[in-house]
Amino acid sequence: MAQNGSESGSTLGGVAGRYASALFELAREERAVDAVSEGLDRFDALLKESADLQRLVRSPVFTSEDQVKAIDAVLARAGITGLAANFIRLSAANRRLFVLPDMIRAFRALVRESKGIVQAEVRLAETPSDAVLEEIKASLRDVARAEVDVDLRIDPSLIGGIVVKVGSRMVDASLRTKLNSIRLAMRDAR
């Protein structure tokens, strides 16, 4: 496991990292990494869509029994079973649901690392065409010399251009940054 400032090194600290590492090792032993990933992705999507589920996960008001009952109902409705479901239940029983989103991120980082995939965050001012997105992915693959998983984010405040972050490196070629640089240069020239 990389601990040298790479994405997984920074993601795997604390409780989230310990839980994610334990889950990853168990999933790998049971040859269930893809199934666990799918279950966690499904739960993460539900979490992002449901304000009620977010409250359940974040609120200290609910007892662990209440959380486990509610989580059981959510898992059953979503069809999440096996190791992923047991992990989510364990998080609820141990009153760690509030850390679950970080655990899921850390697990994803371990999966990417095990498959030799690099995570890249790409921010653009507007949604790119499929062709442009493929060009960006191809360029990132060439630079990283690895398969790249692109997390695309739309940020209209960039005005134009692109901001790319891979690991601890970031390249900001946005129009907003260029305009700010010009503004500073002109102010200093006075």
From Swiss-Prot:
What's the stated role of this polypeptide? F(1)F(0) ATP synthase produces ATP from ADP in the presence of a proton or sodium gradient. F-type ATPases consist of two structural domains, F(1) containing the extramembraneous catalytic core and F(0) containing the membrane proton channel, linked together by a central stalk and a peripheral stalk. During catalysis, ATP synthesis in the catalytic domain of F(1) is coupled via a rotary mechanism of the central stalk subunits to proton translocation.
Name by which UniProt lists this protein: ATP synthase subunit delta
Q: How does it assemble?
A: F-type ATPases have 2 components, F(1) - the catalytic core - and F(0) - the membrane proton channel. F(1) has five subunits: alpha(3), beta(3), gamma(1), delta(1), epsilon(1). F(0) has three main subunits: a(1), b(2) and c(10-14). The alpha and beta chains form an alternating ring which encloses part of the gamma chain. F(1) is attached to F(0) by a central stalk formed by the gamma and epsilon chains, while a peripheral stalk is formed by the delta and b chains.
Coiled coil (UniProt feature): none
Protein origin, superkingdom: Bacteria
HAMAP family tied to this protein: ATP_synth_delta_bact
Gene Ontology terms: cellular component: plasma membrane; proton-transporting ATP synthase complex
MF GO annotations: proton-transporting ATP synthase activity, rotational mechanism
Q: Which gene encodes it?
A: atpH
Q: What SUPFAM superfamilies would the database entry show?
A: N-terminal domain of the delta subunit of the F1F0-ATP synthase
* Entry keyword set: ATP synthesis, Cell inner membrane, Cell membrane, CF(1), Hydrogen ion transport, Ion transport, Membrane, Transport
What the entry lists under Gene3D superfamilies is as follows: N-terminal domain of the delta subunit of the F1F0-ATP synthase (1.10.520.20)
What Pfam families has UniProt attached to this entry? Answer: OSCP (PF00213)
Protein localization: Cell inner membrane
* Family per similarity comment: Belongs to the ATPase delta chain family.
